[in-house]
Every structure is written in structure tokens, then in C-alpha cells.
Regions:
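Short N-terminal leader segment in a subset of presequences, especially plant chloroplast
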Residues: 9-13
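Bacterial N-terminal signal peptides that target proteins for export
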Residues: 1-8
Length: 197
């Protein structure tokens, strides 16, 4: 019995030390799984192309011109003082033949460039924060949603991480009905996000 409790104490100590470490690592970004079975062959998977970055992983859809989903880990070690990038970026790392959404594609649409993996979750370095400003991490969001309940949930998840928890998050758009903004970026009928603590 004494050995059992000692082992549990060591595991608890190890886990509490690990959760404070940054989770900027491609291998850690898909602990919630690959919900659409996205794969890395760009020819066979134009609507479900898997991209794994150090900051987040996602299944990209070249038809809707946005992610099907984005997954990332969040701990207190992922939040620093680099601040928010002042710019959005065209994602030139998408496969050849995929449309690269421009920051100006959302101009005049009435929709925000809504982050899936949010800026505030990747502020240890400026480079980490810049990556979440790739347009391939955006979906059109109504300003009331993006700046309201969506932003509040992002803040809540960071609060959970700040108190020592590891938060596994996956989010995405859904309910497409054929409406688009400039350059054919699809407008989702709803947005969704799941956080596992």
C-alpha cells in the first residue's frame, strides 16, 4: 500500500511539473485526435488536407478555403509576453494549387477574420504568434460571435491553463449553405469548439 501511494505521489508530481511546460510541438497538437481522418496527400485530400505545425494542427479544406478543424494544446507555458501580431498573413506553405486566402479577402464582407487557434494562446514568442495569424487559421465569424462568446471562451480556456491545467482544444466551422465572401471563402452557419481539461 505504501509503494502504491508513493508511486501516485511521483506521478502527480511529474504531471504537475509537465503541465507548466509549453506545448509548442507538432506531436502534441492532435491529442484530441484527427476527427476527419485528414491526410497529407494534397492531390487526394484537397478537402481534408492535414497540416501539423508546432503551434497547432488542422485539416484544411481548399473548397471552403478554411480549416475543417484546428486542434491545439494549451498550458500556462504557452502564454507569454510577445503580444499580438499586428498583421494577418497569406499562408504560402499551403500545397501548390491550393488557393491562398489573402487578408484582404475579408475586407468589406461584414465578417471578422476569426481565429481558430487564438492569438492569446500562442504568445511565448513573436514567431509563434505570427503563425496563428496565417489566413489558413481563420474562418469568417460574425463580429458579435467572434468578439463576444467566442472571445470569452478563449479567455476562459486560458484561465484554466493559468491555474495549472492542460487544456486540449479543437474547433471549427460547420453548417455551410453555399454563401461565400470574396475569393470563395465559405461562410459557416455555425462555429464549434470543444475543450477537454
Amino acid at each position: 500500500m505504501k509503494i502504491y501511494f508513493s508511486a501516485l505521489a511521483l506521478v502527480a508530481l511529474f504531471l504537475s511539473a509537465v503541465t507548466a511546460l509549453a506545448t509548442i510541438n507538432p506531436a502534441l497538437q492532435m491529442q484530441t485526435g484527427n476527427p476527419s481522418a485528414a491526410a497529407t496527400d494534397p492531390i487526394a485530400n484537397r478537402t481534408n488536407f492535414l497540416i501539423q505545425r508546432a503551434q497547432y494542427a488542422f485539416g484544411y479544406n481548399d473548397t471552403t478555403r478554411e480549416p475543417n478543424w484546428v486542434a491545439w494544446n494549451l498550458t500556462s507555458g504557452d502564454v507569454g509576453s510577445s503580444g499580438r501580431s499586428p498583421d494577418f498573413f497569406q499562408d504560402t506553405t499551403l500545397p501548390a494549387g491550393f488557393y491562398q486566402v489573402l487578408p484582404t479577402d475579408y475586407s468589406g464582407s461584414g465578417y471578422d477574420r476569426g481565429h481558430l487557434c487564438p492569438s492569446g494562446d500562442r504568445t511565448v514568442t513573436r514567431a509563434d504568434n505570427d503563425v496563428v495569424f496565417f489566413m489558413s487559421n481563420m474562418m469568417p465569424q460574425a463580429p458579435d460571435n467572434n468578439q463576444g462568446v467566442w472571445a470569452s471562451f478563449e479567455t476562459y480556456c486560458r484561465t484554466l491553463a493559468d491555474t495549472g491545467n492542460e487544456v486540449l482544444i479543437i474547433a471549427g466551422p460547420g453548417g455551410f449553405a453555399g454563401s461565400t465572401i470574396a475569393s470563395g471563402v465559405s461562410i459557416p452557419g455555425f462555429t464549434w469548439k470543444i475543450a477537454v481539461v
